[in-house]
């Protein structure tokens, strides 16, 4: 039996520790990572992939994939507790630690202000940004269908981040502070990491690596020097 009251209390405590302004050790970041989490074997295994890209070229220089036994069932609002063990395992495998991590998921744009990007950022003490594909909480004004349509994401009078249409006629991204990155900087860094797709390159690569997509398989054959 999962004690959700205890988890809520932990979320609120950790959320109070999140740094919501820029606190970079390396400016500009020399290496930017993307992190993506998924599940295998009907949820029994949690898989995390982290892709390390050199900035500003956005070339992939390292990737790591970790698989761990899933220790918590799916409970809405508590997904970070289910995902972070695999993220930590992948993080420990990295040879080159990044200066900034874009996480496929929410940062402070969470009912208790602790999505996986914030939770993971606190655990490894690295600047993180949440780049989510769906809204978890908050409201925003309707967006134009054009590329770069933008609106603040707000909840209870607080701006949690940005809703940004990165590509015309595609669903928008929900961008928020994870840890040690301000809201405006979070948006700016995601925009700097775009290369014509809906997703920024770091999380696009992490997703491709985690899913072993054909495009990644072809790329890997051409770049055997990239380390795992």
From Swiss-Prot:
**Any one Gene Ontology biological process term?**
DNA repair
Disulfide pairs?
none
Q: Where is this site: Interaction with target DNA?
A: 74
PANTHER family according to UniProt? ENDONUCLEASE V
Q: Where in the cell is it found?
A: Cytoplasm
Give the organism the record lists. Answer: Serratia proteamaculans (strain 568)
Q: What does this protein do?
A: DNA repair enzyme involved in the repair of deaminated bases. Selectively cleaves double-stranded DNA at the second phosphodiester bond 3' to a deoxyinosine leaving behind the intact lesion on the nicked DNA.
Q: What class of enzyme is it?
A: hydrolase
Catalyses: Endonucleolytic cleavage at apurinic or apyrimidinic sites to products with a 5'-phosphate
Give the residues the record marks as binding Mg(2+). Answer: 36, 104
Q: What is this protein called?
A: Endonuclease V
Upper classification of the source organism reads: Bacteria, Pseudomonadati, Pseudomonadota, Gammaproteobacteria, Enterobacterales
Alphabetically sorted, this entry's keywords are: Cytoplasm, DNA damage, DNA repair, Endonuclease, Hydrolase, Magnesium, Metal-binding, Nuclease
Domain of life, per the record? Bacteria
The family database entries (NCBIfam families) matched by this protein are listed as:
PRK11617.1
Q: According to its UniProt record, which protein family does this protein belong to?
A: Belongs to the endonuclease V family.
Q: Which one Pfam family would you cite for this protein?
A: Endonuclease_5
- This protein's major location comes to cytoplasm
User: Could you cite one Gene Ontology molecular function of this protein?
Assistant: magnesium ion binding
Identify the cofactor(s): Mg(2+)
A single cellular component GO annotation: cytoplasm
Per the UniProt entry, the Enzyme Commission number(s) are 3.1.21.7
